[in-house]
Amino acid sequence: MTALPARGEVWWCEMAEIGRRPVVVLSRDAAIPRLRRALVAPCTTTIRGLASEVVLEPGSDPIPRRSAVNLDSVESVSVAVLVNRLGRLADIRMRAICTALEVAVDCSR
């Protein structure tokens, strides 16, 4: 990784436990350089149709295959495992991700 990730970006993440997969950066930009960590949501090609998922499409989103952002599986990772930036999601897509995260952590009450 040469540059720090930013909120709303999609990066390839390489971890021994999960291998290589795209993730969406959820952390606020101010926290990333101080903590050297980022809260990320993994992308999966298994689309379950849950309210806690957001489907991304190649062509309109910076993702190689049709995938779902899984907001039930967010985790904090070292920026060192974020190895290649794929691009940035549109604001409308990030709003959908925030709504799905609210569902995943049951904060809508």
From Swiss-Prot:
It comes from the Bacteria. It comes from Mycobacterium tuberculosis (strain ATCC 25618 / H37Rv). Toxic component of a type II toxin-antitoxin (TA) system. Upon expression in M.smegmatis inhibits colony formation. Its toxic effect is neutralized by coexpression with cognate antitoxin MazE5. Probably an endoribonuclease. It is an enzyme of class 3 (hydrolase). Belongs to the PemK/MazF family. PANTHER family: ENDORIBONUCLEASE MAZF, ENDORIBONUCLEASE MAZF-RELATED. Gene3D superfamilies: 2.30.30.110. The lineage of its organism: Bacteria, Bacillati, Actinomycetota, Actinomycetes, Mycobacteriales. Forms a complex with cognate antitoxin MazE5. Induction: Repressed by Mce3R. This is Probable endoribonuclease MazF5. Its EC number is 3.1.-.-. One of its GO terms (biological process) is mRNA catabolic process. Keywords: Endonuclease, Hydrolase, Nuclease, Toxin-antitoxin system. InterPro entries: PemK-like (IPR003477), Plasmid_toxin/cell-grow_inhib (IPR011067).
